[in-house]
Amino acid sequence: MEKIGGVFDEYVIILCYDDSRDNTLKILTDYVNKNSRFRLLINTTLVESSCRTHKIANARNHCLKHMQEYFSNYKYFIMMDCDDVCASPVNLEVLKNNMKRTDWDGLSFNSSRPYYDLWALSMKHLVYSCWHFSQPNTHQIYKDAIQHLFRTCPPGELVSVYSAFNGFAIYRTHKFINSCYDGQSRLDLIPPFLMEQNKRICGEITPYYWGGPDQDCEHRSFHLRAIFNNDAIVAISPEVLF
């Protein structure tokens, strides 16, 4: 995170902590004491839900609210997962070069291993959750579709999508500052004609494949709101960042 922050003239790192059964909080607190750029938010407004995406959306919104209140004048903000997906060496030149472009407002990246984040992905003809259609066919359809888009993307161009994350994304603040994350299935945010295209390819919508209460990837609502409210342009760079 600090290496990425060094690309900018000024930066802060905002992390939201809610609960754990290990020494995560101590590790984070020790780091705060060593780095004045680090903002640790202790989230006391936990959601009463067993759904993972509902909890993650709550934490991401907590970070977003802090940014809205204190750093809304920043030109960019980054949402980044803290797992092994972003643990590989980062290619800062890829980030720097893409920041010179003007054809995106929200940008994520390809990865060195097969593209994993299919749940956050909304493509032009496959806009809804890959886990809300019959399996295993739909998961493979989405996997094949994104790989086809990468293969056929002209050199130097970006892949246009409605939503994508893949562990890391950078946003132009003024286009996403008033959006928010939602881990619920927000079919009301998807235009009917796009939903019909999706169903023609994958069949009718089914209950959430992994069982339990219904949920959807929180990134989809975040991106769709910005697209339809602020004309945001969401894209994926075929280049590998991590």
Language-model features: where?
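Short active-site alpha-helical segment characteristic of glycosyltransferases
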Residues: 218-222
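Conserved catalytic core of nucleotide-sugar-dependent glycosyltransferases
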Residues: 84-203
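Short, acidic, metal-binding catalytic loop of nucleotide-sugar glycosyltransferases
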Residues: 1-10
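Conserved donor nucleotide-binding strand/loop of the catalytic core
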Residues: 29-58, 62-65, 69
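A conserved acidic beta->alpha catalytic loop
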Residues: 3, 16-27, 45-48
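Short glycine/serine/threonine-enriched helix-capping/active-site loop
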Residues: 43, 107-110, 237
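Active-site donor/metal-binding and catalytic loop motifs
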Residues: 174, 198-213, 229-242
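Short beta-strand-to-loop acidic/aromatic patch adjacent to the donor-nucleotide binding site
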Residues: 65, 71-87
